[in-house]
Swiss-Prot record:
One Pfam family of this chain: Glyco_hydro_14
Induction and repression of expression: Circadian-regulated, with a peak in expression just before the light period in short day conditions.
Its job: Beta-amylase activity. Major cytosolic beta-amylase isoform in rosette leaves and inflorescences stems.
GO cellular component, one term: secretory vesicle
Protein known as: Beta-amylase 5
GO biological process: response to herbivore; starch catabolic process
Gene Ontology molecular function terms on file: beta-amylase activity
Gene3D superfamilies: Glycosidases
Main location: cytoplasm
EC code(s) of this entry: 3.2.1.2
SUPFAM superfamilies per record: (Trans)glycosidases
Keyword terms: Carbohydrate metabolism, Cytoplasm, Glycosidase, Hydrolase, Polysaccharide degradation
Effect of loss of the gene: Almost complete loss of beta-amylase activity in rosette leaves and inflorescences (stems).
Length: 498
């Protein structure tokens, strides 16, 4: 492909990745259809000019046979195919179950030998107030308990990442694997499984707190006693999955969430999540430090009830975000300690996409989260939340990628680090869809040709630095002080249909 660049405009370039199908390596650990994938990837590379792909590397597939019995064969074959085609790889360390969330068309559980532990001790799973277990990811309560053939949950994740590094060293060394996104919760996101469709949640329900397993219960009681309130228990008045905030004692106006007890609980609940991310990213940093690779973690775009005073859906997911308390900057500060990238979602959504009763505000949410990450000095990448094929969604993605547009004289003030398109399917290649998708990639690239040298657009990957300091409660409290967002233009200056 002949290339033609304007060097200053190239500094506005946002690389585009495409997420591979969930079952590209199937549950039997077989790369089942390399021919079809190769044909599709060639078209993405040669006709659309995409920069790379993102792929889930499922724990439930790799370590399915037993503790430390890792089998990377199918993934090595897949990655070698991708490398041969000249594409880069964003690899997700997927420690969660596939199945039970939006868009999950295949089922890949966590390893059977881990689930066997859960048969005898179901408290290893996140649990709601009624006692219903969520088996898609292990509870934070067992992060440091040696319940898994002598290993803790964090050791399971750490050993897996070490094995990945050893087995993929040549591809990391060659600059093919550029990002390691560390799964930190359900759907690979740093959150609690507060809105599981498998338990009957429907949009825009408030969701439920997921901290009623015996391990987290004990942790909370100890924290409450230490704070001088041994009588405090976990919330009993926070409602059920599909309630509205005003129907609950916890989230209603002047409800429990604004009381001393409610604030204590929310601080504990959200801090557990942030320290969970901090510990596992710390392990990932130890493993990958010194290698030319980026670390990343994904934060969920919980845009519904954002305009309700309680932000109930965010609170149940573990994001303690209110009009007068910043729930996202503390996460960004935690990531900054490990030189991590914040990966966000729902970039395609507009406030008008949902009914008024959802009190949904994805545009303001994206603006808030991206701004807070940039204020903490870290990079932000992102993806669309739902399948998107139209100009309206693409133009919104382009606006978020460069909120103040292209700078003809060099690097723009605000620019996302990368965009990952969800997801590769036959529908993408339908004629009109593919033509528009090609335009999206071209506009993301600031109307420049595909550029294989990331240094030319300011993305040279340097060896990952060692985590710089211990995250403290003071760090979180400081970052939680409210601060404004950057200004966004009303629309992108590079429309796909403009």
């Amino acid at each position: 492909m002949a290339t033609n660049y304007n060097e200053k405009l190239l500094l506005n370039y946002v690389p585009v990745y495409v997420m591979l199908p969930l079952g590209v390596v199937n549950v039997e650990n077989v790369f089942a259809d390399p021919e079809t994938l190769e044909t599709q990837l060639k078209r993405l590379k040669e006709e659309a000019g995409v920069d790379g792909v993102m792929v889930d590397v499922w724990w439930g597939i790799i370590e399915s046979k037993g503790p430390k019995q890792y089998d990377w064969t199918a993934y090595k074959t897949l990655f070698q195919l991708i490398a041969r085609l000249g594409l880069k790889i964003q690899a997700i360390m997927s420690f969660h179950q596939c199945g039970g969330n939006v868009g999950d068309i295949v089922t890949i559980p966590i390893p059977q030998w881990v689930r066997d532990v859960g048969d005898n001790d179901p408290d290893i799973y996140y649990t709601n107030r009624k006692g219903t277990r969520d088996i898609e990811y292990l509870s934070i309560g067992v992060d440091n308990l040696p319940l898994f053939a002598g290993r803790t949950a964090v050791q399971l994740y750490s050993d897996y990442m070490s094995s990945f590094k050893e087995n993929m060293a040549d591809l990391i060394e060659a600059g093919v694997i550029v990002d390691i996104e560390v799964g930190l919760g359900p759907a690979g996101e740093l959150r609690y499984p507060s809105y599981p469709q498998s338990q009957g949640w429907v949009f825009p329900g408030i969701g439920e707190f997921q901290c009623y397993d015996k391990y987290l219960k004990k942790d909370f009681k100890e924290a409450a006693a230490k704070a001088g309130h041994p009588e405090w228990d976990l919330p009993e008045d926070a409602g059920e999955y599909n309630d509205k905030p005003e129907e609950t004692g916890f989230f209603k106006k002047d409800g429990t969430y604004v009381s001393e007890k409610g604030k204590f609980f929310m601080t504990w609940y959200s801090n557990k999540l942030i320290f969970h991310g901090d510990q596992i990213l710390g392990e990932a940093n130890k493993i990958f430090a010194g290698l030319k690779v980026n670390l990343a973690a994904k934060v969920s775009g919980i845009h519904w009830l954002y305009n309700h005073h309680s932000h109930a859906a965010e609170l149940t997911a573990g994001y303690y975000n209110l009009f007068k308390r910043d729930g996202y900057r503390p996460i960004a500060r935690m990531l900054s300690k490990h030189y991590g990238i914040l990966n966000f979602t729902c970039l395609e959504m507009k406030d008008t996409d949902n009914t008024a009763e959802a009190l949904s505000a994805p545009q303001e949410l994206v603006q808030e989260v991206l701004s807070k990450a940039w204020k903490e000095g870290i990079e932000v990448a992102g993806e669309n939340a739902l399948e998107t094929y139209g100009a309206k969604g693409y133009n919104q993605i382009l606006l978020n990628a460069r909120p103040n547009g292209v700078n003809p004289n060099g690097k723009p003030k605000l620019r996302m680090y990368g965009f990952t398109y969800l997801r590769l399917s036959d529908t993408v290649f339908q004629e009109n869809n593919f033509e528009l998708f090609k335009k999206l990639v071209r506009k993301m690239h600031a109307d420049q040709d595909y550029c294989g040298d990331a240094a030319k657009y300011g993305h040279e990957i340097v060896p990952l630095k060692t985590s710089n300091s211990q995250l403290t409660l003071e760090d979180i409290a400081d970052a939680a002080q409210p601060s404004g967002a950057f200004k966004w233009d009303s629309e992108t200056d590079l429309k796909v249909d403009g």
